[in-house]
Amino acid sequence: MRVLILSADQFEDVELIYPYHRLKEEGHEVLVASFKRGVITGKHGYTVNVDLAFEEVNPDEFDALVLPGGRAPERVRLNEKAVEIAKKMFSEGKPVASICHGPQILISAGVLRGRRGTSYPGIKDDMINAGVDWVDAEVVVDGNWVSSRVPGDLYAWMREFVKLLK
């Protein structure tokens, strides 16, 4: 499967790095998209190569989506093309994994009303206002959406996401 990660500078390092390597370990092709090709830098200084600019992404060419957290989603959600990618993939029932502030992109896409999920507690009100049945749990699976809260939830988050990809 081809998995797309949407992110930008100031991502939460482990929330991008862990799923990237975990999914590659499972044999999936994993590509990172951001505002432009090159390199993005995490909150703690880790750098990641960007394979595609948002404008180059054709969501039909990907089977699943990962939305890491940190400060990056605040900026990514302002990019019309990135939000369009997330909306299309989520609405088509493709597996989507979000953690921490990652759901901010899905909130902007308007796809979460009536869904059950979790996030970083700091955006709980935003999630509820977007129509999410917010739960304080390490991982929540609702159909094609797997959500988690914080880096401590990474193993449970990816364990459930990998199950969806099989």
UniProtKB/Swiss-Prot annotation:
Q: What EC class does the entry list?
A: hydrolase
Record's keyword terms, sorted: Cytoplasm, Hydrolase, Protease
Q: Which domain of life is it from?
A: Archaea
PROSITE patterns for this protein: PEPTIDASE_C56_PFPI (PS51276)
Query: What reaction does this catalyse?
Result: N(omega)-(1-hydroxy-2-oxopropyl)-L-arginyl-[protein] + H2O = lactate + L-arginyl-[protein] + H(+); N(6)-(1-hydroxy-2-oxopropyl)-L-lysyl-[protein] + H2O = lactate + L-lysyl-[protein] + H(+); S-(1-hydroxy-2-oxopropyl)-L-cysteinyl-[protein] + H2O = lactate + L-cysteinyl-[protein] + H(+); N(omega)-(1-hydroxy-2-oxoethyl)-L-arginyl-[protein] + H2O = L-arginyl-[protein] + glycolate + H(+)
Question: What does UniProt list as catalytic?
Answer: 101
CDD domains attached to this UniProt entry? GATase1_PfpI_like (cd03134)
Q: Name one GO biological process term.
A: proteolysis
PfpI endopeptidase domain location: 1-166
Name its cellular compartments. Cytoplasm
Q: Does the keyword Amino-acid biosynthesis apply?
A: no
Q: Can you tell me which residues the record assigns to a coiled coil?
A: none
What are the GO MF terms of this UniProt record? peptidase activity; protein deglycase activity
Q: What's this protein's family per the entry? A: Belongs to the peptidase C56 family.
What is this protein for, i.e. what is its function? Deglycase that catalyzes the deglycation of the Maillard adducts formed between amino groups of proteins and reactive carbonyl groups of glyoxals. Thus, functions as a protein deglycase that repairs methylglyoxal- and glyoxal-glycated proteins, and releases repaired proteins and lactate or glycolate, respectively. Deglycates cysteine, arginine and lysine residues in proteins, and thus reactivates these proteins by reversing glycation by glyoxals.
Which PANTHER family is this protein grouped with?
DJ-1 PROTEIN, DJ-1_THIJ_PFPI FAMILY PROTEIN
Q: Provide the protein name.
A: Deglycase PYRAB04690
